[in-house]
Amino acid sequence: MNKLIKAEFYRSMRSGIFLPIYALMSLFTIYMTFLTYRDSSLVDGDGYELFAFLASYSEGGVMVLGEVIGIIISLMIGKLYSDRFHYYEIMDGANTHHIILSKLIVYNIYSLVIVVVPAAVSYTAVAVNYGTGGIEKPWLPILLLTIIIMNATSLVLLLSMIIRRAIIGAVISYCYAMIIIMLYMFYDAEITGVSNKFTGFLFDTSPYIQITKLGYDYTSAEYIAMVAGSFVVTVSLLYTLTYISHRRKNFR
């Protein structure tokens, strides 16, 4: 397992595409959190700065950043299958569970470093400088952000491992996010609510929509349950489907 994780890190870092884009996205996230921090520091009010930062960050392009990460992961995973690299892993004695888990661990670490770490640092800086403003459990938004990002990353990664085609996986990932976002904007769910229960369920369980509500609903028990529940159900279901699809291809 450790060898597979190290090999996955090495492969991704050796990629001529992944590392430059990873560096650019890291810089973009740091820049975005800096702008959000600067805007929140201009807010007048007793402790409102932390809430302003949280609300601005959750609406300030994190959703788009998550989708970019998804497309890159789809392309990276698809390339591994097009190069038939997974057969070498099997020949080296790796089993299906270890192959899937190693990729989940590596790419979730990348996503957390790109998205969550800069947000956590800036969030902490605002809290230290201006106080928490009476926000209960100030650590909770960062924990929820971590779960949401892991949900989005795992969803794209496991779908890509099932599809095994770089372009198709990236297109499906992009279309899913765009359709959900466009439907959400059409229904204007934050203001008017959603009358269609199925559409409302899609919004509540989609990480791309959950992240836009982070700055406002992080204290809601229903929101917390949806974030945690959708993560567990999505990863469990897609992990099972990924394992079955690999076993059918005579994997161990």
Residue ranges of predicted features:
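Aromatic- and glycine-rich beta-strand/loop motifs that create alpha-glucan
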Residues: 1-25, 251
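Helix-capping/transition residues at the boundaries of transmembrane alpha-helices
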Residues: 11, 78, 89-91, 156, ...
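Alpha-helical transmembrane segments and their helix-entry boundary regions
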Residues: 18-21, 89, 99, 168-170
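Short hydrophobic, aromatic-rich alpha-helical segments embedded in or entering the lipid bilayer
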Residues: 191-215
